[in-house]
Amino acid sequence: MKLRDSLAENNSIRLQAEANTWQEAVKIGVDLLVAADVVEPRYYQAILDGVEQFGPYFVIAPGLAMPHGRPEEGVKKTGFSLVTLKKPLEFNHEDNDPVDILITMAAVDANTHQEVGIMQIVNLFEDEANFDRLRACRTAQEVLDLIDRTNAAA
């Protein structure tokens, strides 16, 4: 499942969202996947439990979080949601706070998680200017166009 296709088909982009805590921000992304029938509602609690156990493991770059749980924690099919926050939030990550871009990922197996999910997100942000380009997006179509341009350049 391609990041762009998943976002378009699942209508799972929310821009300039407002959240007061990192937990609320994560829930926005998970709720988009629940609405698209990608994950069960329990996927949200699984992510929170993971943070309790391992810390903010999914904050992977300055300003960028990739919330995800394990396949057996309520994943129905592979999919992504993308959320940008109006106001960046602290996720208690030593190096990469504050966060204002969340790409929530659900993968049906570990292989898909690694090869499909993480690689597509790495490719999107290989050009660091894409962080600010994404922050500037105000419509879902602008996000999809940015991903298209990035894929065409790769």
UniProtKB/Swiss-Prot annotation:
Domain PTS EIIA type-2: 6-150
Keywords: Cytoplasm, Kinase, Phosphoprotein, Phosphotransferase system, Transferase, Transport
A GO CC term attached to the entry: cytoplasm
Gene3D superfamilies per the UniProt record, alphabetical: Mannitol-specific EII, Chain A
GO biological-process terms attached to the record: phosphoenolpyruvate-dependent sugar phosphotransferase system
The keyword Amino-acid biosynthesis is annotated on this UniProt entry: no
Compartment annotation: Cytoplasm
The UniProt record lists the keyword Methyltransferase: no
One Pfam family of this chain: PTS_EIIA_2
Task of the protein: The phosphoenolpyruvate-dependent sugar phosphotransferase system (sugar PTS), a major carbohydrate active transport system, catalyzes the phosphorylation of incoming sugar substrates concomitantly with their translocation across the cell membrane. The enzyme II UlaABC PTS system is involved in ascorbate transport.
Notes on the domains: The PTS EIIA type-2 domain is phosphorylated by phospho-HPr on a histidyl residue. Then, it transfers the phosphoryl group to the PTS EIIB type-2 domain.
Protein name in the entry: Ascorbate-specific PTS system EIIA component
Lineage: Bacteria, Pseudomonadati, Pseudomonadota, Gammaproteobacteria, Enterobacterales
